[in-house]
């Protein structure tokens, strides 16, 4: 699982960050692991990597935080994109046996609710 940053003028790769998740995670043919979109508000970049966690980066690609969401198990895999609102990163995961709606601080990854 990776997040990549490209230069908007020439398309050159500026940086790439990978997350390792060793367990097999279900996904669907029409919903691959890249279905969840990264989000930015001009201050941070946040990516949902499914069971590998929710991760915040700065614009240089430095990992600011990692939030462990636990193992997600549903036939369609991960497709929920995070939302940034004020100082919060809001994220929902489901359906499946383990569903959640959380908010973490977008700069630190600390759980707010």
Task: For the regions a language model picked out, list residue spans one by one.
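Noncatalytic, solvent-exposed loop/strand surfaces
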Residues: 1-113
């Amino acid at each position: 699982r990776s997040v990549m940053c490209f230069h908007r003028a020439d398309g050159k790769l500026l940086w790439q960050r990978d997350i390792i998740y060793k367990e097999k995670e279900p996904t669907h043919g029409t919903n691959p692991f890249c279905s969840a979109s990264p989000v930015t508000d001009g201050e941070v970049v946040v990516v949902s990597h499914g069971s590998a966690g929710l991760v915040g980066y700065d614009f240089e690609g430095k990992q600011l935080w990692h939030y462990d969401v636990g193992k997600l198990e549903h036939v369609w895999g991960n497709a929920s994109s995070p939302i940034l609102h004020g100082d919060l990163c809001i994220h929902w995961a489901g359906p499946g046996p383990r569903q959640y709606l959380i908010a973490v601080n977008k700069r630190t990854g600390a759980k707010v609710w």
